[in-house]
Every structure is written in C-alpha cells, then in structure tokens.
C-alpha cells in the first residue's frame, strides 16, 4: 500500500500527495531495480530519494531522455527491469529511440513522465507539449495512465501486466503535486 502525506501548498491549501519514498519502495517490491532519467522539479522527490542510494536498486542520472532510453534498454538486456524518469518535454527527444528500439524489439520499461503544461498552466515552453503529450504516446502505440493517489495500486498492476505480457514500455503520467517536491 502506498502511504500518503498531507503537504501544504500556497496559502494553507492542503493537497494530498504520495510520498516519494513509499512509491519507490512499491516499485522495488514490483522488481523494478534500475532507475535513470533527466531531472524535473515535479519528480524531484523521487530523484532525491533515489540519489540517496540506500535502495536495493540503482539510479544512474542521464544527460538526455533518448540516452536514458538507451540505458533502460541496456539494463533490461542485462536482466533488470528499468524505470525512466522524465519530463514530458523530453518526449520529443526520445520518441525515435522508443519507436526504433523498444517498440520494434519489444523491450519494456516503466516510464514515469511529469505532465508539465497541463491545461495551459505552466511556463510557456511547457504548454504545447502539455496539450499533445498523450496524443504523441497514442500515435506511437505507447500505452499510458495518468497516475493519481486513488488509482496508484490499480495503475501499477496494469503497467506491470502490460510490461510483462507485451514487453513494451508503459508510461505513468504524473501531475504537479502528486509527489513531494524537493529543491
């Protein structure tokens, strides 16, 4: 069971969020043992926890999203189930790697992608990708779910089943405020 916390945001508004620590523990229970990715403030709590290196999993930072896809492929071929952490703005960088490597050769990975620019609320450079990221995933034939505290267990089960049965990447889209952020 993923544990939640109440965090204060803005002017005393309480928003429930998953703890990064409990979510990583849950992924490790599901046998995800290799993590890589490119930093994003919405995923900063996850990255902070992974950098602590107290886990029975390995975290290797990546310089670009397409390079992270390559690291995930290597980890999978070496026998480890990989997780890629990235901002949705990096989807354009890594689509070619996914379509010419993972999708053709059936190499799975769990992708945790932040949803910057959702509903036009973010810095201007994130708004276009925030509007089209899900359509890009669909067009590429990559399944996804929008992760929430309420559907976490169900979505993790679905992702694991798709990854194991179909040997394809599966994306969890993460909205701002779902995980604790650290700066």
What are these regions (language model features)?
Residues 2-183:
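Thiamine diphosphate
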């Amino acid at each position: 069971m993923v544990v939640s916390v109440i965090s204060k945001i803005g002017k005393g508004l309480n928003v429930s969020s998953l703890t990064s620590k409990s979510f990583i523990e849950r992924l490790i229970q599901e046998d995800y043992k290799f993590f890589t990715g490119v930093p994003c403030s919405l995923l900063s709590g996850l990255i902070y926890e992974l950098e602590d290196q107290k886990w029975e999993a390995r975290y290797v930072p990546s310089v670009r999203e397409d390079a992270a896809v390559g690291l995930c492929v290597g980890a999978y071929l070496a026998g480890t189930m990989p997780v890629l952490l990235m901002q949705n703005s990096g989807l354009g960088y890594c689509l070619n790697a996914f379509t010419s490597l993972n999708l053709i050769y059936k190499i799975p990975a769990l992708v945790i992608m932040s949803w910057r620019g959702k509903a036009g609320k973010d810095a201007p450079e994130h708004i276009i990708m925030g509007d089209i990221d899900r359509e890009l995933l669909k067009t590429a034939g990559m399944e996804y779910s929008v992760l929430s505290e309420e559907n976490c267990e169900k979505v993790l089960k679905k992702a694991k089943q798709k990854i194991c049965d179909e040997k394809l990447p599966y994306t969890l889209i993460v909205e701002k405020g779902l995980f604790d952020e650290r700066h």
